[in-house]
UniProtKB/Swiss-Prot annotation:
The gene is petG. Belongs to the PetG family. Pfam families: PetG. The keyword Plastid applies. Disulfide bonds: none annotated. Its main location: plastid. This is Cytochrome b6-f complex subunit 5. The 4 large subunits of the cytochrome b6-f complex are cytochrome b6, subunit IV (17 kDa polypeptide, PetD), cytochrome f and the Rieske protein, while the 4 small subunits are PetG, PetL, PetM and PetN. The complex functions as a dimer. It is found in: Plastid thylakoid membrane. The lineage of its organism: Eukaryota, Viridiplantae, Streptophyta, Embryophyta, Tracheophyta. GO terms for cellular component: cytochrome b6f complex; plastid thylakoid membrane. It comes from Cuscuta reflexa (Southern Asian dodder).
Length: 37
């Protein structure tokens, strides 16, 4: 059951991480800055 629990956590974290990256890139784009990491 631990594997299923960890799998659920990962599936929940992936969309949050992608959303965070998208928002960060969008804010940088709006400020006119290049996407240099």
């Amino acid at each position: 059951m631990i594997e299923v629990f960890l799998f659920g956590i990962v599936l929940g974290l992936i969309p949050i991480t992608l959303a965070g990256l998208f928002v960060t890139a969008y804010l940088q784009y709006r400020r006119g800055g290049r996407l240099d990491v």
